[in-house]
């Protein structure tokens, strides 16, 4: 690899390459500044947007031409003869904003408008200044029609890392790129009480929003272009490269604690019964009108490096969020969002080292310290009164480290061939500390805090990409090919002994249940007439709230992946473009796969384009899905009861007839159109996603017959085939009238997923993947979501009003786990009728809701702006449910979430 890099350097060292910085102002014919004008160096993907005052700075090659485009205005091309440019845009003959994109096409000239596949381009600076959203997942939840993410509660690790998805697919079925380079996933696998259970995803919140120029969302299958995971689409995050500009903001906000609902007297976190966070999680303290207070401080600054257009751009971000507490049942007094303290640093660097040759480095470090309440222990064998009189609510705290760095060389030969050689290293480490807890088998001698171990994932990716544009072949041919080599390593590391062990009455870890026994307490439900009833109950071991990983759980596994791809786009005429891609992948642990893609765009008129694509795709099983395991032991007078989430390569897994995990296989198709009528633009795209062999997590199987001292077993399996159809809609309008700027956008997604097949083989279907599991999978996204965004601005003031409608969502609660006979209403009912009774009782229906966001912005000076506003202004909550809800509160984590109205103020600056 070093020889290749040296060869590329020597190949181009003879050429001298000069860049310069050009700045200026863009105005309309009346002299009003135009913010958000798209500016692109012609023939490249190098581009910026104008700021609030219409100003811009951009680094370009000598002699470059800049293209200025803005919705409702004529596009203007301007040569960069000097360092200062003044541009006047004419409202006649308006054109659609044509963002040049990196994702979805390897052509440096392809824009959103003329792409053959749907792409959203989100200007993060605009979104962050026009809303109170603090993290990337929150921003995208309301800015992108098919993106969905929600804060979780009572879901162990998922309380600390939000699961997110595109088009209702799994969190691991969307590929994330940073500046076109593959981003590593989180080491966390979602297991309990959350969407995306059995999946790993990429933690977008580990990337500071202030470091991002724009986010490109390719809403189409792209495994043939980018490899594994790109079944639902690709999210490419393009980071800032501006210089001589110091920007940032200080934001403070808090949530309204007045949760709307009809709650019984004494309900935790209602008036007079707010959980006292200074106690053990089982006593009440003072009322609060607001909670979840958050402070975010972010800054971004870039400086030139050398005199030929080099730069280093640095972002720092600090975010502190307190817990929210919402009405919960007696067994979940700490229902609400986790507390979080986070520090983010990101650096983007590039410098020319020869003619048309650039060295680049980018990467960041994110650290988060999080704290979430688990379920409450009120009494019984899990409570030691000497430590926690009256019970306690344990806290699951975590330390999350996310680090990444990418480095590479980009160059262009004299013949127009472009080469990009890079290496990207990323690692996520997730450590658990359980606080306010105990190991009940140690009784009053138990510590109240344990190191419970954790897990990590390392990914190293090496890429070599080549491309060339042939302008003389028909309307233009862009040819690209390349290779990728990836190494992945997954680890589970054990916690301290007390976090996982069960101790006998002498305080010695139990290794032989025939000679050792755990401490017991009297069984309050003992029935002498019942031969299965015991007069005593054994105290369980391990840290309450989250049992630690033991040495038996430890894993240190790795694999490699090698891929080759080719990608071509041909403009047959000015109206017709076709593209195709083929990619070969070989994994060291499961074998190889080949995938392809065809796409086309037809200009029906100057204003309307028709586009469509069809592709095959795949997702390799993650190392976590193959090797993750949990093993914990319950002891009673009758002996040991062991429960195991078995790794895919275990003997127990094979004994149940469950096969080695294979890749998920997908077929994607899309058809849509774009329309541009000056001030008005629209895109509508329908899609089909068929996925075979989706990897899911089974229910608990009886394993006592295996003779392996395991009583219950659970597995990852290629268990489900799904079919998803849907429609994405984006309609926008912009108009400038004198000094007034008006804009409106309607974005929406309609999504329908069906389960075609449950691949349970000879195993009982309801245990393999039961009704509750199906409901959680199908509710990964609301059946439809629409948002109407209205904006107004002038020199010193701007305002935004947004309405987001979430459709009805249905889930099945814990009543599906009860004895079906409890739901028999007549002795003559059939089992099928009883089942329907139970399912009807277990159905939690969340009716459609509309959420309103409002923001007001005031220019205090040329460099400072004050914004105030509210997310969920009218304090809307999902419909209230009963005490069978998964998370122990009165709502699941659906639609707009369970936190209510959020009010904020932000002071932004730009020097």
Indicate residue ranges for each PLM-predicted region.
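Extracytoplasmic beta-strand/coil segments of soluble accessory domains associated
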Residues: 57-59, 137-186, 233
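N-terminal periplasmic accessory domains that precede
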Residues: 83-90, 136-139, 143, 162-164, ...
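Transmembrane beta-barrel wall of Gram-negative outer-membrane proteins
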Residues: 244-247, 269-374, 385, 394-408, ...
């Amino acid at each position: 690899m070093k020889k290749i890099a040296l060869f590329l350097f020597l190949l181009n060292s003879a050429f001298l390459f000069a860049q310069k910085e050009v700045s200026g102002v863009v105005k309309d014919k009346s002299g009003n500044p135009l913010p958000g004008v798209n500016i692109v160096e012609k023939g490249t993907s190098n581009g910026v947007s104008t700021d609030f005052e219409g100003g811009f700075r951009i680094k370009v090659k000598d002699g470059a031409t800049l293209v200025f485009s803005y919705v409702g205005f004529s596009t203007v091309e301007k040569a960069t003869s000097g360092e200062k440019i003044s541009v006047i845009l004419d409202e006649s003959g308006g054109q659609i904003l044509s963002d040049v994109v990196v994702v979805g096409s390897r052509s440096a000239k392809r824009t959103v408008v003329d792409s053959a596949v749907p792409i959203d381009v989100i200007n993060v600076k605009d979104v962050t200044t026009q809303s109170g959203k603090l993290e990337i997942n929150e921003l995208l939840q309301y800015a992108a029609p098919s993106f969905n993410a929600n804060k979780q509660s009572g879901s162990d690790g998922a309380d600390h890392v939000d699961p997110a998805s595109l088009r209702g697919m799994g969190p691991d079925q969307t590929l994330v790129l940073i500046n076109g380079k593959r981003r590593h996933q989180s080491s966390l696998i979602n297991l309990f009480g959350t969407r995306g259970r059995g999946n790993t995803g990429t933690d977008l919140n580990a990337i500071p929003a202030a470091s991002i120029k724009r986010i490109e969302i390719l809403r189409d299958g792209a495994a043939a272009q980018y490899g594994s995971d790109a079944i639902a689409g690709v999210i490419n995050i393009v980071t800032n490269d501006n210089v001589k500009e110091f920007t940032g903001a200080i934001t403070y906000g808090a949530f309204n604690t007045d949760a709307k609902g009809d709650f019984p007297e004494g309900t935790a976190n209602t008036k007079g019964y707010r959980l006292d966070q200074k106690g053990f999680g089982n006593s009440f303290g003072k009322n609060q009108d607001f909670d979840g207070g958050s402070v975010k401080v972010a800054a971004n600054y870039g400086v030139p490096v050398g005199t030929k257009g080099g730069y280093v751009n640095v972002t720092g971000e600090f975010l502190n969020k307190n817990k929210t507490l919402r009405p919960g049942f007696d067994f979940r007094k700490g229902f609400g969002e986790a507390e979080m303290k986070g520090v983010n640093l990101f650096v983007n660097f590039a410098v020319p080292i020869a003619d048309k040759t650039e060295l680049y480095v980018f990467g960041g470090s994110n650290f988060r310290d999080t704290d979430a309440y688990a379920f409450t222990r009120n009494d019984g064998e899990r409570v030691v009164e000497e430590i926690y009189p009256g019970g306690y609510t344990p806290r699951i705290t975590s330390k999350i480290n996310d680090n990444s760095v990418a480095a590479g060389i980009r160059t262009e030969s004299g013949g127009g061939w472009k080469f990009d050689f890079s290496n990207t290293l990323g690692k996520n480490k997730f450590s658990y500390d359980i606080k306010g807890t105990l190991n009940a088998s140690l009784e009053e001698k138990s510590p109240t805090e344990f190191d419970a171990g954790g897990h990590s994932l390392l990914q190293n990716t090496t890429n070599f990409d080549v491309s060339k544009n042939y302008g003389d072949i028909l309307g233009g041919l862009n040819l690209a090919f390349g290779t990728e080599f990836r190494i992945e390593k997954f680890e589970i590391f054990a916690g301290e002994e007390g976090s996982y062990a069960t101790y006998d009455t002498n305080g010695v870890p139990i290794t032989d249940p025939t000679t050792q026994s755990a401490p017991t307490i009297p069984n309050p439900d003992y029935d002498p007439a019942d031969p299965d009833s015991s007069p005593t109950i054994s105290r369980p071991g391990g840290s309450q709230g989250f049992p630690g990983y033991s040495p038996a759980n430890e894993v240190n596994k790795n694999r490699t992946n090698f891929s080759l791809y080719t990608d071509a786009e041909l403009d047959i005429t000015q109206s017709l473009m076709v593209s195709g891609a083929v990619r070969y992948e070989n994994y060291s642990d499961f074998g190889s796969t080949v995938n392809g893609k065809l796409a086309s765009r037809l200009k029906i008129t100057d204003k309307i384009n028709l586009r469509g694509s069809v592709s095959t795709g795949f997702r390799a099983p993650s190392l976590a899905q193959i090797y993750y395991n949990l093993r914990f032991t319950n002891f009673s007078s009758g002996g040991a009861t062991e429960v195991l989430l078995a790794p895919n390569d275990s003997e127990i897994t094979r004994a149940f007839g469950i096969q080695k995990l294979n890749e998920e296989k997908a077929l994607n198709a899309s058809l849509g159109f774009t329309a541009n009528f000056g001030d008005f633009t629209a895109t509508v795209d329908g899609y089909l996603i068929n996925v075979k062999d989706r990897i899911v997590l089974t229910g608990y199987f009886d394993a006592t017959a295996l003779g392996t001292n395991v009583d219950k077993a659970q597995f990852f399996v290629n268990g489900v085939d799904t079919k998803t159809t849907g429609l994405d809609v984006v309609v926008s309008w912009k108009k400038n009238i004198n000094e007034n700027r008006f804009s409106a956008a309607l974005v929406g997604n309609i999504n329908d997923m069906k389960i075609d097949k449950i691949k349970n083989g000879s195993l009982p279907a309801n245990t393999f993947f039961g009704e509750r599991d199906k409901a959680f999978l199908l509710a990964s996204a609301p059946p439809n979501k629409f948002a109407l965004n209205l904006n107004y601005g002038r020199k010193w003031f701007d305002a935004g009003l947004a309405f987001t409608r979430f459709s009805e969502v249905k889930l099945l609660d814990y009543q599906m786990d009860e004895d079906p006979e409890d739901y028999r209403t007549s002795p003559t009912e059939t089992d099928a009728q009883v089942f329907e009774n139970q399912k009807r009782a277990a159905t939690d229906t969340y009716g459609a809701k509309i959420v309103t966001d409002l923001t007001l912005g005031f220019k205090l000076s040329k460099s400072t702006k004050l914004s105030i506003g509210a997310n969920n202004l009218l304090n809307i909550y999902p419909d209230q449910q009963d005490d069978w809800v998964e998370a122990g509160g009165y709502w699941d984590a659906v639609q707009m979430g369970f936190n209510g109205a959020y009010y904020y103020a932000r002071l932004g600056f730009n020097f």
